[in-house]
Amino acid sequence: MIKQQELYEAFLTRVEPEHRAFAAELHELFVNNGCTVEINPTSSGFLVSYKFASTKKAVANFVFRKSGLLLRLYADHASRDEALLSALPEDLLAAIRKAPDCKRLTRSGACNPRCAAGYEVIIRGERFQKCRYNAYLFPICMENNPFLQSIIERELTARTQAEA
């Protein structure tokens, strides 16, 4: 446990100062909602994974890139909430558009046989079939943070209710 705490503190020091409080807030949200945390050093910083403890399925990852800190969401339940997705700002919608299409959903080619299919969603009348690993890969920034937190809260609530 001490090693994980040390890794978490090292992760926070790599986060831009203006985003540390938000990263810490999300960390607490995940932990308080029954997620396990796995932190691994990478060449570009850290990969911080949050998994729903009972199902062991990933909910989110913090990922460092040259452009800064990104949050990858596995929004299996929130993806079905059309109102939530329609309220996304244009920058987040652009990130979804930019994500590669899911090869399994579009049947355009072979994907890894163990790969879970991506997300098929309709946002503002536009249909997307995106890879689950890049569909919801969003930059952490002041404009995006409230929307990211909203998606996470809905996803955690839906996963908890699905267990009940």
Residue ranges and their predicted role:
Residues 1-164:
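Charge-dense, helix-prone N-terminal extensions
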